[in-house]
């Protein structure tokens, strides 16, 4: 419904909601009736938005802008594409509301031509309902760059023709939080592409780090800053790699994190100290945002300071006023294999031995440690007195967490991670076929792997499929191999 709310705008949305309640208050209304009320109240046909419920896959939105200074005309071409899926080989164009602003060289949003009866505005919603369309803005002073999908106006993957300098400009000057974050993500992905290509110098990486270093010293919202300082998630990046080399992708992402940490340098420790002293344990949004930044600073600081930062993290673990902070400190120590990690792990196990939900987190943290020898650690943890294959939550925390969130260990080049999950599936299937089937879904993307790992994982799947399995597990295996 956020799609429709974004398409209509606040005033039209309220008008439509008033009409909806006038018609259906107290009734079990359908989505069709809801859209009909909103649309008819505003003279707009919203029924095409039902296609979002019926069509699988995430649309890709490609944007290309062009400015004609002679005619003072800015043209924005939008194109959408949704990749075919086995259940729907032919995808239709969806209605995609795209909130747009054009920023001037000083960062101001340029005034856009007003429609009849409307006040002047600095952004607008363009609806792309066809595979491709060009939108023309007349009488526009020279724009520096277009800001797209403001307010996350549609759940799509955005691809633009913005250069690294354009993205850095948006990151510095855009007032919309989502557009700012999207610019940071695109710039990070561009830097990562350069690292993966083995380029001796990656200008995008320098621009990304320099821009974030400048923002780090401003009074930007802490919650937003924490997100800007976080590169795209590994699993998200993996979806765009074909073939996928998990080790290379993980190493490239580590390069981004390490380079950013060195660029921020001593400022990380100083900001962490400041945030820690001002932390009062509040539950409001601002307090949660400060804690998010506090934890992000600690993770980056631990990468470059091998003496003071681990001691601070160990102290934070002991004195943490919340589970969020305790887990962040422990996770940071584990990720960097700090000497203090072992003692903290032992303390956590003792402290929460009787708390099953919290102990799940203890298993999950260890399963996610980004080291090749985590395969052996996970195998050993299966023998822990508090681990049981009969406990679905414990299996999910340790084994599913390992396979889904630890690319370095799970995709180890010798196939040990695959064999670990293969054996676990055999054991679990005899006890709980539903849990086994859920765990098996972590193996389904084997075709996208580079040849060596693809062959190893396929062999594991074939051995499982050849054995006697439950209907639930067998169905997942057949679909994965079919």
Put a short name on every predicted segment:
Residues 23-29, 122-133, 155-162, 242, ...:
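Short, exposed beta-strand "edge-strand" segments with a Pro/Gly-rich flavor and a Y/T-containing core
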């Amino acid at each position: 419904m956020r799609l429709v709310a974004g398409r209509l705008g606040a005033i039209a949305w309220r008008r439509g909601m008033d009409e909806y309640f006038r018609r259906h208050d107290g009734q079990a209304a359908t989505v069709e009736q809801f859209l009909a009320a909103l649309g008819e109240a505003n003279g707009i046909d919203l029924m095409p938005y039902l296609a979002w419920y019926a069509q699988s896959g995430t649309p890709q939105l490609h944007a290309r802008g062009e400015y004609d200074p002679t005619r003072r005309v800015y043209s924005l071409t939008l194109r959408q594409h949704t990749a075919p899926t086995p259940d729907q080989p032919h995808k239709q164009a969806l209605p995609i509301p795209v909130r747009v602003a054009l920023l001037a060289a000083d960062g101001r949003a340029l005034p856009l031509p007003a429609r009849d009866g409307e006040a002047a505005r600095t952004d607008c919603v363009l609806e792309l309902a066809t595979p491709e369309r060009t939108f023309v803005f007349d009488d526009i002073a020279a724009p520096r760059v277009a800001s797209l999908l403001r307010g996350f106006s549609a759940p799509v993957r955005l691809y633009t023709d913005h250069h690294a300098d354009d993205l850095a400009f948006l990151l510095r000057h855009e007032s919309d939080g989502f557009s700012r974050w999207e610019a940071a993500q695109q710039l990070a992905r561009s830097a990562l592409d350069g690292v993966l290509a083995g380029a001796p110098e990656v200008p995008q990486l320098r621009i990304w780090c320099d821009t974030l270093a400048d923002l780090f010293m401003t009074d930007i919202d802490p919650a937003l800053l924490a997100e800007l300082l976080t590169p795209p998630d590994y699993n998200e990046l993996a979806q765009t790699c074909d073939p996928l080399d998990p080790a290379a992708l993980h190493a490239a992402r580590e390069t981004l994190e390490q380079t950013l940490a060195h660029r921020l340098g001593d400022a990380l420790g100083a900001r962490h100290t400041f945030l820690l002293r001002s932390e009062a344990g509040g539950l409001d949004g601002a307090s949660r945002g400060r804690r998010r930044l506090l934890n992000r600073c600690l993770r980056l600081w631990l990468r470059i300071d091998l003496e003071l930062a681990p001691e601070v993290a160990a102290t934070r673990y002991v004195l943490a006023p919340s589970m969020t902070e305790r887990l962040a400190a422990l996770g940071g120590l584990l990720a960097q294999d700090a000497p203090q990690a072992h003692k903290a792990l032992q303390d956590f196990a003792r402290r929460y031995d009787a708390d099953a939900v919290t102990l799940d987190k203890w298993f999950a943290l260890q399963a996610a440690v980004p080291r090749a020898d985590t395969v052996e650690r996970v195998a050993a943890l299966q023998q822990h007195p508090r681990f049981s294959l009969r406990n679905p939550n414990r299996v999910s925390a340790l084994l599913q967490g390992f396979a889904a969130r630890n690319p370095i260990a799970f995709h180890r080049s010798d196939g040990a991670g695959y064999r670990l999950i293969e054996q676990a599936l055999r054991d679990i299937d005899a006890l709980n076929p539903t849990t086994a089937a859920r765990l098996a879904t972590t193996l389904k993307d084997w075709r996208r792997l580079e040849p060596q790992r693809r062959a190893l994982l396929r062999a594991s799947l074939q051995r499982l499929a050849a054995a006697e399995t439950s209907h639930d597990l067998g169905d997942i295996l057949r679909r994965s191999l079919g």
